[in-house]
Amino acid sequence: MRDIEKFIRGFSRFQEQYLKEPTALDSLRQGQHPRTLVIGCCDARVDPALLTGCDPGDIFVVRNIANLVPPCAPDAPPGVSSAIEFAVCGLEVARIIVLGHTMLGLMQLSPRHSRRNP
């Protein structure tokens, strides 16, 4: 239950911070216009907005396991490629950043690692 209380307190702080400045969210009401797409890992320790000090609307973020970008194929799931296409073609981002990190949990589960460390 403590997690939920922490989320509620955090959301309340967010609302207080952004609502005390009446124009803070005005531009966001008009839609999103980020200039950067960040492809990052879904690891809970690596939050692109928190790490870069960005405000809401500054970056468009795609997160997945190990920040992998699978090749676009007709029979492949469209999640990552669709998000990238939306960012590039729809939002017209100026840059793409792939945000990697150390101690990647996926590598702990890789077949090679599993054979060495049963």
What name fits each language-model region?
Residues L50, P56-P118:
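Short HxH-centered metal-ligating active-site micro-motif
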Residues M1-P78:
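Short, conserved "active-site rim" segments that organize catalytic pockets and cofactor/ligand binding
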